[in-house]
């Protein structure tokens, strides 16, 4: 069957799926539209029902596409173009992995047809599609592939690469062979006419360049688009059925939603039949001019559901809450804990009368995944069913009607008030079908405190909140238009009691479509949890910003005398710096720490240190895999990136990672601006003198953070000390404009080193809340200061103010830094900003005492002493780049930057090695590093060593670190040499440190336990 490759189809719109019913068309045109719709439906039904049993499935696709290009487009070009493109994409994706069609001329012509029709104006995407075909082996035995690909390269003026490509086809004996030779001969004639002549040196270069061009890094866009929307599809039968018998609520933003949506084919067929049949013969034809639909919403957006309660003797009350989640069936009842557990995939419910065997379900899922590509992508919004609740608790549901034509009729019936008195049950229900062991909360007691002011986050506070909800109710009249449903941004009140109202129960206020399938990645139940939780956290009765982050509130704090000793809990200490350009640090006294709004007695910092090994066991299961290394091409010059910190470059890298960031368990994306960072800073500065602290509540996680103080402020970020509702201290890094790069790097480090104990020496990111204008990175908090703080502390202890750090302590910290650099370099991460104030002190106090002699393997308690490496905002992931890639700085360099940066030369790992030298120099000399360059081009320290230092050790270290990029035969990273020097230092410590190093560490450990920020700059020396 022949395809006209010269035909062109112009114009394409992605959001039309049927023939538009034009106004003023003739009856013959309507009949023609109806016939085309019926033919289209017949083809779609054959694709779904007959394709799997056909000997030649490509033949059906060809018939369908030729019918569209010859009949459909002639009647309606716009809709026909979309249908043609969708059909071609489905055909290419469905057939591409069938070995029979790899070198079928018909299949190759469809690829070329698609490229010429829809990608002709995009050279990058056209070339990427050809590269994808080449790597998949599609058409590589056919001359047509090389001819068309060479034409594309020729038009882009890659003349020699196009010639080499034709020669490659001839070497592979592609058919028809004689035609390919003629094409090659004609092309050589054209090159001679253009005076493009090859020489002996240009031929190998052309072949190497062609090999580089044939390496594809991402699949074509339409394939990535399909994978985004279909591979994460999950069947409704595999999750708790919370969507049955509920009305249509406001549709939640779909994190995994693509522009193409999988829809029910049966509903689509019925809709097409309905559109074609609704043409009255005696109807008056209207004017064909299009009118602007101001309030029309073709997607039939869902509407909020709420309850109106009339309690005798009280004002009418409206509760934005979906009670159909509590009573999904006549004989079933769930409490709020069970509902949240089911939403998160932690609670499985076996419906009565609905038995599905595992074999049947698995077979059905496999068939659906295989045929999913054949289904036209549409959005299906079926009408909602009336909610069903038990008779004893039946209440009226007020929601906007989806059918405007019947709004008047329903309005009269819905506004009727039915007064019913009952108590909403919140007791836990024990069910045998638990996906995990979930603890059952004790039932509420009637003797719970009813005090309106609760200052501690305790059982009494929980009972108080629940008791406010467990009261009699009745359904009053509808809410008036003038009623205020907004919330203020900031409120100051004297305690921590919060009302259980709309802004606090947002996660349960939405009604889901019972027929709508949730799109999610089938990886882990935890991933599905975040997806479904995010979709259920929107309500249309609140201001738009309340969807994403609750107002920041301030509370007046008072010191509480500890009565009950809280259990000791170990947590990892956190980042307390804002990264580079740290300017100021706000005073934090023991009074502010002890005046917690959450706990009676905050946990001592020395007892809140978590072993990273435990954390790594609980790490996310579906972190992105390490991207495979690029294929190294011999004699290829290294890639040099001029502006390595460019936001556009980072955005490009993040757009190509797989899986994408929004699938990370601790990544929470909000599709809205927040504009709260400056307001948060202002309120904190005003309220800290009154001992009132703002509270930040992230709705997608339910995490509450009380801002305790300001740790640091830079050019783009401010770091706050925040206390969680569990009493854990966290560092909250607020960055404007929003940034995700540091979170990505830290997530990659945690995943790639998940089996290594070195993670205890790297700060951990708990979560990232990303808004359009700013980002909130939640980090673990380290309370013992930085290496720079330790240096300044040692200087202050000296009488003349010029004290320096103990040499053995310098060696110990140097060894710990080398261990971290070795590991992150092994997994392709360059820190890029290594300096004293990005290294935190980690002197944990576990039960095991510190041994008298230094142990390099960490025994005798030495594994609990070390550093934290923080601030990965200027880091690089070398696995995203070709091997040997280097960077050129576009910022002004100084003595704190490596020699390559200052000389304007390319660099890579040299930045970390020079940074390590700078940290060591600061510890030894008590001042920032200064270097001079010798006549032979090598660098050395400007300041000489003291006579009593171990010059044989420090000389070797600085010579290697300062000149890491000088040796021509030195391959970076030079991990083996770093390990060799580290072993030298460790051997010296084991042989000579004896009790001295232990005593020094215990001494500074005691000093740092009382360490408090005094609001003075860190970088002072």
Curated annotation (Swiss-Prot):
CDD domains: STKc_Bub1_BubR1. Residues 582-596 have a biased composition (Low complexity). The active site is at 833 (proton acceptor). GO terms for molecular function: ATP binding; identical protein binding; protein kinase activity; protein serine kinase activity; protein serine/threonine kinase activity. Changing residue 314 to A: Decreases binding to a peptide containing a phosphorylated MELT motif. Disulfide bonds: none annotated. Signal peptide: none annotated. One of its GO terms (biological process) is centromere complex assembly. It is found in: Nucleus; Chromosome, Centromere, Kinetochore. InterPro entries: Bub1/Mad3, Kinase-like_dom_sf, Mad3/Bub1_I, Mad3/Bub1_II, Prot_kinase_dom, Protein_kinase_ATP_BS, Ser/Thr_kinase_AS. Residues 289-359 are annotated as: Interaction with BUB3. It catalyses: L-seryl-[protein] + ATP = O-phospho-L-seryl-[protein] + ADP + H(+); L-threonyl-[protein] + ATP = O-phospho-L-threonyl-[protein] + ADP + H(+). SUPFAM superfamilies: Protein kinase-like (PK-like). Residues 19-35, 517-528 have a biased composition (Polar residues). It holds the Pfam family Mad3_BUB1_II. Residues 1-35, 351-370, 398-420, 511-545, 567-600 are annotated as: Disordered. Involved in mitotic spindle assembly checkpoint signaling, a process that delays anaphase until chromosomes are bioriented on the spindle, and in the repair of incorrect mitotic kinetochore-spindle microtubule attachments. The formation of a MAD1-BUB1-BUB3 complex seems to be required for the spindle checkpoint mechanism. Phosphorylates BUB3. Also autophosphorylates. Associates with centromere (CEN) DNA via interaction with SKP1. Part of complex consisting of MAD1, BUB1 and BUB3 after activation of spindle checkpoint. Part of the BUB1-BUB3 complex, composed of BUB1 and BUB3. Interacts with SPC105 (via phosphorylated MELT motifs); the interaction occurs when part of the BUB1-BUB3 complex. Interacts with SKP1; the interaction is direct. Present with 414 molecules/cell in log phase SD medium. This is Spindle assembly checkpoint serine/threonine-protein kinase BUB1. It comes from Saccharomyces cerevisiae (strain ATCC 204508 / S288c) (Baker's yeast). The gene is BUB1.
């Amino acid at each position: 069957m022949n395809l006209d490759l010269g035909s062109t189809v112009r114009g394409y719109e992605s959001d039309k799926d049927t023939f538009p019913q034009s106004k003023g068309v003739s009856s013959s045109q309507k009949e023609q539209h109806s016939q085309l719709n019926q033919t289209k439906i017949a083809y779609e039904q054959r694709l779904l029902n007959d394709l799997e049993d056909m000997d030649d499935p490509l033949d059906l696709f060809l018939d369908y596409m030729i019918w569209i290009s010859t009949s459909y487009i002639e009647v309606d070009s716009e809709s026909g173009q979309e249908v043609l493109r969708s059909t071609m994409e489905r055909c290419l994706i469905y057939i591409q992995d069938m070995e029979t069609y790899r070198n079928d001329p018909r299949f190759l012509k469809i690829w070329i047809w698609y490229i010429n029709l829809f990608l002709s104006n995009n050279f990058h995407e056209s070339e990427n599609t050809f590269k994808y075909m080449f790597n998949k082996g599609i058409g590589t035995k056919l001359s047509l592939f090389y001819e068309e690909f060479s034409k594309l390269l020729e038009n882009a003026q890659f003349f020699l690469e196009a010639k080499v490509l034709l020669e490659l086809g001839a070497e592979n004996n592609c058919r028809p062979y004689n035609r390919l030779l003629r094409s090659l001969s004609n092309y050589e004639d054209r090159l001679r006419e253009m005076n493009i002549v090859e020489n002996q040196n240009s031929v190998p270069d052309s072949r190497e360049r062609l090999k580089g061009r044939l390496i594809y890094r991402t699949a074509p866009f339409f394939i990535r688009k399909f994978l985004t929307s279909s591979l994460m599809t999950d069947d409704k039968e595999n999750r708790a059925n919370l969507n049955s018998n509920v009305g249509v609520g406001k549709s939640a933003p779909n994190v995994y939603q693509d522009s193409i949506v999988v829809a029910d084919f049966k509903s689509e067929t019925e809709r097409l039949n309905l559109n074609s049949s609704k043409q009255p013969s005696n109807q008056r034809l209207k004017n064909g001019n299009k009118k602007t639909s101001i309030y029309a919403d073709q997607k039939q957006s869902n509407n909020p559901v709420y309850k109106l309660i009339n309690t005798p003797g009280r004002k009418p009350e409206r509760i934005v809450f979906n009670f159909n989640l509590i009573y999904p069936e006549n004989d079933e009842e769930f409490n709020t804990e069970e509902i949240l557990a089911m939403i998160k995939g932690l609670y499985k419910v076996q419906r009565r009368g609905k038995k599905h065997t595992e074999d049947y379900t698995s077979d059905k899922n496999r068939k659906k995944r295989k045929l999913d590509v054949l289904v036209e992508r549409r959005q299906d919004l079926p009408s909602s069913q009336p909610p069903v609740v038990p008779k004893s608790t039946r209440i009226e549901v007020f929601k906007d009607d989806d059918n405007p034509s019947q709004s008047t009729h329903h309005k009269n019936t819905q506004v009727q008030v039915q007064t019913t008195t009952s108590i909403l049950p919140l007791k836990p229900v024990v069910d045998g079908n638990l996906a995990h062991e979930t603890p059952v909360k004790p039932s509420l007691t009637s003797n719970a405190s009813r005090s309106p002011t609760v200052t501690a986050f305790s059982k009494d506070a929980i009972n108080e909140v629940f008791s406010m909800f467990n009261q009699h109710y009745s359904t009053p009249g509808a809410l008036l238009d003038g009623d205020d449903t907004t919330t203020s941004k900031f409120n100051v009140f004297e305690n921590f009691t919060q009302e259980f109202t709309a802004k606090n129960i947002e996660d349960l206020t939405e009604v889901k479509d019972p027929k709508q399938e949730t799109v999610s990645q089938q990886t882990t139940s935890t991933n599905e949890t975040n997806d479904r939780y995010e979709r259920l956290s929107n309500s249309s009765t609140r201001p738009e910003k309340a969807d994403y982050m609750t107002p920041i509130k301030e509370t007046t704090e008072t010191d509480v005398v500890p009565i009950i000793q809280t259990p000791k809990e170990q947590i990892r200490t956190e980042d307390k710096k804002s990264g580079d350009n740290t300017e100021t640090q706000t005073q934090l006294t023991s009074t502010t720490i002890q005046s917690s709004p959450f706990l009676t007695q905050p946990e001592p910092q020395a007892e809140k240190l978590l072993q990273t090994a435990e954390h790594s066991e609980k790490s996310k299961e579906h972190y992105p895999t390490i991207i495979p290394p690029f294929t190294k091409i011999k004699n290829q010059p290294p890639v040099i990136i001029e502006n390595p910190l460019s936001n556009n470059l980072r955005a490009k890298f993040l757009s190509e990672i797989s899986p994408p960031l929004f699938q990370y368990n601790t990544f929470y994306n909000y599709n809205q601006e927040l504009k709260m960072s400056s307001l948060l800073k202002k309120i904190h500065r005003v309220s800290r003198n009154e001992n009132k602290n703002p509270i930040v509540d992230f709705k997608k996680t339910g995490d509450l953070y009380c801002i305790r103080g300001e740790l640091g402020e830079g050019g783009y970020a401010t770091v706050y000390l925040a206390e969680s509702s569990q009493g854990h201290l966290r560092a909250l890094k607020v960055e404007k404009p929003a940034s995700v790069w540091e979170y990505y790097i830290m997530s990659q480090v945690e995943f790639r080193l998940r089996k290594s104990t070195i993670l205890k020496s790297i700060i951990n990111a708990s979560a990232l809340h990303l808004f359009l204008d700013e980002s909130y990175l939640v980090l673990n908090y380290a309370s013992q200061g930085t290496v720079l703080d330790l240096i300044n502390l040692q200087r202050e202890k000296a009488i003349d103010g010029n004290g320096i750090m103990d040499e053995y302590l310098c060696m110990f910290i140097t060894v710990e830094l080398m261990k971290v650099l070795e590991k992150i370099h092994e997994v392709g991460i360059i820190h890029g900003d290594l300096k004293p104030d990005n290294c935190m002190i980690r002197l944990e106090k576990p039960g095991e005492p510190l041994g008298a002699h230094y142990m390099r393997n960490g025994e005798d308690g030495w594994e609990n002493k070390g550093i934290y490496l923080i601030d990965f905002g200027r880091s690089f992931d070398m696995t995203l780049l070709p091997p040997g890639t280097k960077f050129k700085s576009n910022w002004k360099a100084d003595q704190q930057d490596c020699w390559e940066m200052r000389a304007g030369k390319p660099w890579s790992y040299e930045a970390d090695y020079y940074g390590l030298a700078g940290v060591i120099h600061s510890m030894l000399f008590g001042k920032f590093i200064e270097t001079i360059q010798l006549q032979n081009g090598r660098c050395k320290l400007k300041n000489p060593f003291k006579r009593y230092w171990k010059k044989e050790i420090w000389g070797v270290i600085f010579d290697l670190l300062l000149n890491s990029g000088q040796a021509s035969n030195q391959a970076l990273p030079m991990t083996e040499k770093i390990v060799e020097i580290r072993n030298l230092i460790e051997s010296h410590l084991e042989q000579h440190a004896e009790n001295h190093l232990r005593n020094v560490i215990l001494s500074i450990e005691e000093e740092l336990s009382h360490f408090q920020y005094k609001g003075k700059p860190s970088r002072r020396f």
